Amino acid sequence: MAAAASVDAYLAACPEDSRAALEHLRTMIKAAAPEATETISYQMPAFRAHGRILVWMGAFRDHCSLFPGSMALIEAHRDELAGYRVAKGTIQFRPDKPLPAAVVEKIVKARLAENAGRSRR
């Protein structure tokens, strides 16, 4: 996938199933952090608040991913993520099996709290 200039452009370039899954994830992230702004970071959609990135998301050949930016957050919710592939810094999910909204909300709110406590870049 070519580098996208916006989150909308990134999503438009995704296959339909991945686009739908990431649109759903985008909605959950925005609900948990309405003050967050969208950006492209590391050639992926990202959400920024308090001057820092909260989370990234991306579409790949066989899965979609949420990148919380904190392995500690992934570990804290490992039980709730049973059935999803958890790798170094990422939570992978198939487009037909979205992440639970409650877990996304907890992760995003925890990242908001982390970022609020850090100095602005």
What is each stretch, according to the model?
Residues 1-121:
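Charge-dense, helix-prone N-terminal extensions
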